């Protein structure tokens, strides 16, 4: 394990930034697939 004292763990950054990105991408592709992507 790397020493993460005084720093934010990379896995925490990845989780916090990854979940919203995956959600937005999922909504975008779902909207495009259902024909609503162009109206957004």
Swiss-Prot record:
**Chief localization class?**
plastid
Query: Which residue ranges does UniProt annotate as crossing the membrane?
Result: 8-28
Q: Which GO terms describe its biological process?
A: photosynthesis
Pfam families given in the database record: PsbJ (PF01788)
Query: What name appears for this protein in its UniProt entry?
Result: Photosystem II reaction center protein J
Does the record carry Transmembrane as a key word?
Answer: yes
Q: How does it sit in the membrane?
A: Single-pass membrane protein
Gene it is expressed from: psbJ
Record-stated family: Belongs to the PsbJ family.
Query: Which keywords has UniProt assigned to this entry?
Result: Chloroplast, Membrane, Photosynthesis, Photosystem II, Plastid, Reaction center, Thylakoid, Transmembrane, Transmembrane helix
